[in-house]
Amino acid sequence: FEMVNSTDLAKTLNYQSGLRVENNCQNCGFPQVRINGLEGPYSQILINSRPIISALSGVYGLEQIPVNMIERVEVVRGGGSALFGANAVGGTINIITKDPINNSFQVSSMFSNMDGKSWEQYMGANVSLVAKDNSYGIALYESYRNRNPYDRDGDGFSELGKLNMNTFGFRAYYRPTHFSRINLEYHTTNEFRRGGNKFDLQPHETDITEQTKHIINSGGLSYDLFWHEYKHKISLYGSIQHTDRNSYYGAQKDLNAYGKTNDLTWVAGG
C-alpha cells in the first residue's frame, strides 16, 4: 500500500493484475471493480473471509475501507470463487484486517491536488499493544479523508464529488489457553459525499445533486480451538454490519428526492 501511495481500497486494487476499478458516476462518484471484465455485481467482497458487505453498503464500499486497516488483500479470480457467495461469479476480494503483532505506533498524512483545482487530505493512525506472553493484544486504527469537488471542464458540474469520511476500528484477541483464541473486531465509518452543482445550496435548490450520508457499524466475534499439535481446529464465528443511509438523488429542485435506508447483514457459522 505504501508503494502505490493509496488511501483506500479502490485505489489499491488498480494495481492488482486482472482487476480494473472504474468511476461510474460523476455526481455520486461510486467506484466498481471489474474482475476478468465482469461488472461489480458479479464480484464478492469479504472482510476477514466473512460476506457481511451488503448490496447497499457495497455501492460505495471500495472507498469506505481505508488502507491503514488492511493487512493484505486476497484475490480469487474465476468461477471457482462462487464457493464464497452466490454473486462471486467473476471473483472474490478478501480483505484481511491488521492483527496486533507487536507494540507499535504509526501516524501518516498526505495532501494531493488535481489540476490545481481540488485538494484532498488524508490522515491515518495505527496503534498496536501486545502482552509479553502473547496472551492478548489489540490493534486500533483511525483515518480521516477530505476531498473537495473537482470540476475539470469548468461547466459548474463536478466530475468528482465532495467527500468527507472518518473511520475508526480495532481488532483484538485473547488466548485463554495455548490452544484456544478469542477474536473480537469492530469498525465504524461516518461518510458524507455529494456531487452535482451549486455546493453552497441545499440539494433541492440545485439543478442536480446526488448526496449520501452513511453511518456504518460492523463487528465480529470468533473462537478458535486447536488440538493435536495444531493439526486440527474448530472455529465458531459471527459477524454483523448495520448501514444507515440518508440520501438525495434528484434534479430540477425536486423536494421528493430525499430518502432514508437502513440495512442489516449478519452471518454466523463454524
Residue ranges of model-derived segments:
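Flexible loop and strand-edge segments within Gram-negative outer membrane beta-barrel domains
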Residues: 147-167, 173-175, 179-234, 240-264
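Short acidic/polar hinge/loop motifs at secondary-structure boundaries
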Residues: 34, 50-77, 98
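Membrane-spanning beta-strand positions in outer-membrane beta-barrel proteins
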Residues: 44, 104-106, 135-139, 179-185, ...
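Extracytoplasmic beta-strand/coil segments of soluble accessory domains associated
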Residues: 10-51, 71
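Outer-membrane beta-barrel translocator/receptor signature
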Residues: 54-56, 69-71, 82-94, 98-153, ...
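Transmembrane beta-barrel domains of outer membrane proteins
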Residues: 36, 76, 96, 126-130, ...
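Solvent-exposed coil/turn segments that connect beta secondary-structure elements
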Residues: 1, 18, 26, 38-40, ...
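Transmembrane beta-barrel strands of outer-membrane/channel proteins
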Residues: 107-113, 140-146, 184-188, 236-242, ...
